[in-house]
Amino acid sequence: MSLPERSAITGEINAMHKRTGIHPAVLMSYLGLPKSTWNEWHGRKDTETRHNHGTPKSNWVTPEETRKIIEFCGNYKDRLRGYRYLSWLMVDRGVACVRPSTLYRILRRNGLFPKWAAPAELKKKGFDQPTRPNEQWHTDFSYVRVSGVFYYFACILDGFSRKILVWDLFQTMEGLNIEILVTRAKELYPDAHARIIHDNGRQFTSREFLELVARLELMETSTSPFHPQSNGKVERMHRTMKTEEVRRDDYNGGDDARPKMGRWVNFYDSERLHSAIGYLTPDEVFAGKMEERLAERREKMYHADRARQTYWRNRQT
């Protein structure tokens, strides 16, 4: 409330007090205002209301942190990543330790918030979620257009860590190709007794594939017809690969596509932060470093909060 409005009300209350002898606080209560309001107004008589929203708080992001955030996000090229991804990426790289909600407000305030990735549709989760690496392996083929010719990308994806264990780019969708991938994955992880989750393609229902799975001491499960969510982890990885790599590059044949896709797979496993696993990399989760990395981030955030408190305390003194 402005000073003129408050002065007009208090003047009227005082006039009524002189006429009736009723205490001003009681008259305030007749107006539906707490008695404490009169004491507050009387204590700062003839003084404009001063809101404290402009007073720096100890948890405010410092100007230097804001500058670094604006510079980093302004120069970040991949606008398909959301603000949560950028928040934890900056924590890991030591740019600034701010929570996603804080980064959201800074981006909004500085006009650095373009159209990010669309929110995922709420879907069924399919099979029970794995609790450790090499418990569930997902596999499938995906079309990749290379110089006007269709190739077929296939991989084995760990369901717990989202790590791409093995992959290749084939010219056909023969069952032998997927059998080679499963064999390679078993050679890399001989102690694994994973459940291979796949669709109902003929490559996965053939006698040769089923015999190979039994011989390698693995298990297999087919997804329900017309229910791609059951194999959604590998389907989502295929979509990410096409969005971030395939549609951005121009391949001159399969020999040119393989090394470029290989570099992206290495980036996906070792550098790209994955939203489904706490914005960590698949390699970190697969190696059992999830709790260690989350604890490291919590420590960084704690020290950043303490540094901000010290900064604003020194500014006030």
Q: Would you name each region that the model predicts?
A:
Residues 4, 37-136, 286-290:
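Basic, flexible linker segments flanking DNA-binding modules
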Residues 71, 75, 92-97, 101-157, ...:
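Mobile-element integrase/transposase regions
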Residues 214-216, 240-317:
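C-terminal domain-tail junction helix/linker
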Residues 158, 169-174:
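A short acidic/small-residue loop/turn micro-motif
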Residues 195-200, 214-233, 249-254:
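RNase H-like polynucleotidyl transferase catalytic core
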Residues 188-206, 226, 231, 280-283:
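Acidic/histidine-rich, metal-coordinating catalytic segments
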Residues 26-48, 103, 260-279:
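K/E-rich alpha-helical interaction surfaces of small helical-bundle regulatory domains
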Residues 1-33, 42-52, 68:
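Residue-centric detector for conserved, function-critical "anchor" positions
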